[in-house]
Amino acid sequence: MQERIKACFTESIQTQIAAAEALPDAISRAAMTLVQSLLNGNKILCCGNGTSAANAQHFAASMINRFETERPSLPAIALNTDNVVLTAIANDRLHDEVYAKQVRALGHAGDVLLAISARGNSRDIVKAVEAAVTRDMTIVALTGYDGGELAGLLGPQDVEIRIPSHRSARIQEMHMLTVNCLCDLIDNTLFPHQDD
């Protein structure tokens, strides 16, 4: 059991090192995309399933409340938090539309959709991205594996942050770290610290 624990930590560290080498440009582009949208008076819509939903909620909460330092609230909405809306849509046998309907209702040109999907093939996330495209929104996609169907939907203005791994647990860990990185970059770009 001890060796398995060490192997989990080692694999996680190796994934972090690979991501640190492969992803800085994509993360930087994503952060600047989010910052520019906020500076233009727009908002960020976020969605994901399971652990990805938790990462989406964490991002939205960090924007609305704060990340590590006090600052004004920033407009972000996690689309997976309203159980009444989600179950009403799902009850009409529209499971694949639970996020797309919300994107069509709440999204506007200039807004950003932060779509989180480890494999990039979740039907409801794919449909949300398709809806965001019709609303002239920009997409920041957090994926893994080969990017899945989601990667093929992205245009030149969009950003994919694809974790270099084929293990869902490692991808989800790195998605959380990436969300924290994005929050840090947004805060330090919009509200630079005097002592930095």
From Swiss-Prot:
SIS domain sequence ranges: 34-196
Subunit annotation: Homotetramer; dimer of dimers.
PANTHER family from the UniProt entry: DNAA INITIATOR-ASSOCIATING PROTEIN DIAA (PTHR30390:SF6), SEDOHEPTULOSE 7-PHOSPHATE ISOMERASE / DNAA INITIATOR-ASSOCIATING FACTOR FOR REPLICATION INITIATION (PTHR30390)
Organism, as annotated: Shigella flexneri serotype 5b (strain 8401)
RNA-binding listed as a keyword: no
Entry's Gene Ontology molecular function annotations: carbohydrate derivative binding
Family: Belongs to the SIS family. DiaA subfamily.
Protein name: DnaA initiator-associating protein DiaA
Keywords: DNA replication
Entry function: Required for the timely initiation of chromosomal replication via direct interactions with the DnaA initiator protein.
Record flagged with keyword Electron transport: no
CDD domains referenced in this protein's UniProt entry, alphabetically: SIS_GmhA
GO BP annotations, alphabetical order: carbohydrate derivative metabolic process; DNA replication
